[in-house]
Design a protein with these regions (language model features):
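Extreme N-terminal starter segment of soluble prokaryotic enzymes
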Residues: 1-4
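Conserved Rossmann-like nucleotide-cofactor binding loop
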Residues: 11
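An anion/phosphate-binding loop that grips the pyrophosphate of nucleotide cofactors and donors
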Residues: 39
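Structural motif
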Residues: 43-45, 171
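Cysteine-nucleophile active-site neighborhood
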Residues: 48-115
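Amide-donor transfer/coupling interface in amidating biosynthetic enzymes
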Residues: 68, 101-193
């Protein structure tokens, strides 16, 4: 099985590549639209700011490529957020593949922003490789609206989608490459879908 990692020129792409390679996948890092379109599976990793990420996406001419994909596309952390319509972060228009907006997490007594660390999942669709009670690792300050695409949630002041699925799209707000066995199961399920 092969997977193309969309290389926007920053982020946690190396650790994601290693996580896929440990599962036996052949990994290609590229920003070439033709290579992305020819891939069996595509992953859009990301850390950082939505505005910068969408600026890089547009500068590399990848918006149309990504929005036109019909093969499995996995968004990881910021990459998942980019699948939605827009983000409050820098009032950014995103790819618009999933209805909803990305909103800033609000600090509260006992809760810090960014949300960093391990959180327990409530899973409604185990076909993604996750199970109820799994703990996965988060590092984020913004989260998507909870909606029909949500297949696993966590709590951090509010219910946040930890994983989403819609048509050919799969997303993880958490970092599967840092989430031990649960993260490996999630990536393995993506490779098998």
């Amino acid at each position: 099985m092969s997977v193309v990692l969309v290389d926007l020129g920053y982020g946690n792409i190396g650790s994601i590549a290693v996580a896929f390679q440990r599962l036996g996948a052949t990994v290609t890092l590229t920003a070439d639209p033709a290579e992305i379109e020819a891939a069996e599976r595509v992953a859009l990793p990301g850390v950082g700011a939505a505005g910068y990420a969408m600026g890089r996406t547009d500068a590399l001419g990848l918006r149309e490529t990504l929005t036109g994909l019909t093969k499995p596309l996995l968004g990881i952390c910021l990459g998942m957020q980019l699948l939605f319509e827009g983000s409050e972060e820098e009032d950014t228009a995103c790819l618009g593949l999933i209805a909803g907006k990305v909103r800033k997490l609000e600090p509260a007594p006992g809760l810090t922003v960014p949300h960093m660390g391990w959180s327990r999942l409530d899973v409604t669709d185990a076909s993604c490789g996750l199970t109820n009670g799994d703990y996965v690792y988060f590092a984020h300050s913004f989260a998507c609206d909870d909606g029909p695409a949500s297949i696993a949630t966590a709590r951090h002041g509010r219910t946040i989608p930890a994983a989403i699925r819609q048509n050919n799209l799969l997303g993880a707000q958490f970092h599967p490459e840092r989430s031990a066995e649960a993260g490996a199961r999630f990536l393995k399920a993506f490779l098998a879908c």
